[in-house]
């Protein structure tokens, strides 16, 4: 008999709507013993079967659902089916947009909670973020090897969230050859170098692909400030869009060095690109105090909020940094501003920008809205999957 997680009375509603998480407060009891990440059955208070998921006793998310199909086992065949289903959409996108790199698995939205897989050419970069994902590591890798024999697999599960579920951080080659120090990929006509082994996340922010392309429409003959530039994707796109100058700011000299290489790799005019190692908050104040002005500012900060207790502080951070950006823009200038914090809703983020404009003594018009690229889908039953949001704002004086 399988181990069963029994829900408290009335706590089955989210599962009936096919939401993939069971929180600790919804659990009445466990029937049997399960190890970390083991597959269990989830039933309502009367014993009616609801779902099959992975057990995580140390997490607030006590179980993550693998399947709502009673007849479906969690095995190599299960992972193969999920991977093949996800690949169909990525194949279409890759063909339409000319991509050689994309997010293959976007966790819950692809029916594989806690699993992220990015494909960069013939390298699959894996992040296992939950106990259940780690427990199923061997089955997942077996499925990947069968479906993608041409690909090497590299593990970047060196993510702090694993500690919340009682797991160590892991990183290293799984199968195949080690990725090069810098792997060239292609995106909307750009060549970009990706550091799979040591870069942020899996090496590159694929989710901002469409936003980088959209930037080009605003930058012709403009002076651009690219904040939190990382390896310069927005800077390269701005140069391809015909900007007069782009200033890229980041605290990492290693990232800025790659950004410079990316400009050179695309045979763009390096004299139009400036790379500044500095704290963005500090530098924006310095620019303001000495009267610097820009026509376009890209504001793409790291996640400011990890949990609800940090949300108020994050709101202040987003407000301050956008206020400074708005102050630096010429009249008619464009602010392209983003938040990758899942707890920050689009409505709240828009309100923060509006408040920032008031504090800056300017008016802004919202002219375009952004979200994560289409290889990062959001399944309807898991709205939390929409984490990246952004706006193009035009600064005016009424």
From Swiss-Prot:
Gene that this sequence comes from: rlmI
Source organism: Shigella dysenteriae serotype 1 (strain Sd197)
Enzyme Commission designation: 2.1.1.191
Catalysed conversion reaction: cytidine(1962) in 23S rRNA + S-adenosyl-L-methionine = 5-methylcytidine(1962) in 23S rRNA + S-adenosyl-L-homocysteine + H(+)
Domain PUA, first and last residues per copy: 2-79
Single GO cellular component term: cytoplasm
GO molecular function: RNA binding; rRNA (cytosine) methyltransferase activity
Primary role: Specifically methylates the cytosine at position 1962 (m5C1962) of 23S rRNA.
Main location: cytoplasm
Family in the record: Belongs to the methyltransferase superfamily. RlmI family.
Compartments where found: Cytoplasm
Keywords, alphabetical: Cytoplasm, Methyltransferase, RNA-binding, rRNA processing, S-adenosyl-L-methionine, Transferase
Protein name in the entry: Ribosomal RNA large subunit methyltransferase I
InterPro entries linked: PUA, PUA-like_sf, PUA_sf, RLMI, RlmI-like_PUA, SAM-dep_methyl-trfase, SAM-dependent_MTases_sf
One Pfam family, short name: PUA_3
């Amino acid at each position: 008999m399988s181990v069963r997680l029994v829900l408290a009375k009335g706590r089955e509603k989210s599962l009936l709507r096919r939401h993939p998480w069971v929180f600790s407060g919804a659990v009445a009891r466990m029937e049997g013993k399960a190890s970390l990440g083991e597959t269990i059955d989830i039933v309502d208070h009367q014993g009616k079967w609801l779902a099959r998921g992975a057990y995580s006793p140390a997490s607030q998310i006590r179980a993550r659902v693998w399947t709502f199909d009673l007849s479906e086992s969690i095995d190599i065949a299960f992972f193969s089916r999920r991977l093949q289903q996800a690949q169909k959409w990525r194949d279409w996108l890759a063909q339409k947009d000319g991509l050689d790199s994309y997010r293959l698995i976007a966790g819950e939205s692809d029916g594989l909670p806690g699993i992220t897989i990015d494909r960069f050419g013939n390298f699959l970069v894996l992040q296992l973020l939950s106990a259940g994902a780690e427990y199923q590591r061997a089955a997942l890798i077996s499925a990947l090897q069968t479906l993608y024999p041409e690909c090497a697999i590299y593990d970047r599960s060196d993510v702090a969230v694993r500690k919340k579920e009682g797991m160590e951080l892991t990183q290293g080659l799984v199968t195949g050859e080690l990725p090069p120090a810098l792997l060239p990929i292609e995106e909307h006509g750009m060549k970009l170098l990706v550091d799979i082994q040591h870069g942020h996340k899996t090496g590159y922010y694929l989710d901002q692909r469409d936003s980088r392309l959209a930037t080009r429409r605003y930058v012709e003959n403009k002076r651009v400030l690219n904040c939190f530039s990382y390896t310069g994707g927005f800077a390269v796109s701005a140069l391809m869009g015909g900007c007069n100058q782009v200033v890229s700011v980041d605290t990492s000299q290693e990232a800025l060095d790659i950004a410079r290489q990316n400009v050179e790799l695309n045979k763009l005019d390096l004299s139009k690109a400036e790379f500044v190692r500095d704290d963005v908050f500090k530098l924006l104040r310095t620019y303001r105090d000495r009267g610097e002005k820009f026509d376009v500012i890209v504001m793409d900060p790291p996640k400011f909020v990890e949990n609800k207790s940090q949300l108020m502080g994050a709101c202040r951070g987003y407000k301050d940094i956008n206020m400074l950006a708005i102050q630096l823009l010429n009249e008619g200038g464009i602010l392209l501003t983003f938040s990758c914090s899942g707890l920050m809703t689009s409505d709240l983020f828009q309100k923060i920008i509006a408040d920032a404009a008031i504090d800056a003594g300017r008016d802004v018009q919202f002219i375009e809205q952004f979200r994560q690229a289409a290889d990062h889908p959001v399944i309807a039953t898991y709205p939390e999957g929409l984490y990246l949001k952004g706006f193009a704002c035009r600064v005016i004086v009424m």
